[in-house]
Amino acid sequence: MIKANLQLFAHKKGVGSTRNGRDSESKRLGVKRGDGQFVKAGNILVRQRGTKIHPGLNVGKGKDDTLFALVDGRVKFSRLGKDRKQVSIIPA
């Protein structure tokens, strides 16, 4: 009687895990309504982190610095000095 000495080996080499392969979900920040566009009260104008763009007439600011329209009207972007921007709503 012949006894077979059968040994099984891995046919693929074991590999370690990587520390890459993750990324956070985008926050969809930016200007949501353009200059001259008609908006209704409550419409979001700008989503931002910090006050890159400041609220002007008829524009409110949320706790996360989101700018939104307080009245119906047209959007108006303007500059305040050299490095400051502002968005206002001109009532229709």
UniProtKB/Swiss-Prot annotation:
Prosequence residues removed at maturation: 1-9
Domain of life of the native organism: Bacteria
UniProt KW keywords: Ribonucleoprotein, Ribosomal protein
Gene3D superfamilies associated with the record: 2.40.50.100
Gene Ontology molecular function terms on file: structural constituent of ribosome
Signal peptide as annotated in the record: none
Listed GO biological process terms: translation
Keyword Transcription included in the entry's annotation: no
Pfam families: Ribosomal_L27
SUPFAM superfamilies, sorted: Ribosomal L27 protein-like
Post-translational modification: The N-terminus is cleaved by ribosomal processing cysteine protease Prp.
CC annotations in GO: cytosolic large ribosomal subunit
NCBIfam families the UniProt entry points to: L27
PANTHER family named in the record: LARGE RIBOSOMAL SUBUNIT PROTEIN BL27M, RIBOSOMAL PROTEIN L27
Family: Belongs to the bacterial ribosomal protein bL27 family.
Name recorded for this polypeptide: Large ribosomal subunit protein bL27
Organism, as annotated: Acetivibrio thermocellus (strain ATCC 27405 / DSM 1237 / JCM 9322 / NBRC 103400 / NCIMB 10682 / NRRL B-4536 / VPI 7372)
Gene name of the record: rpmA
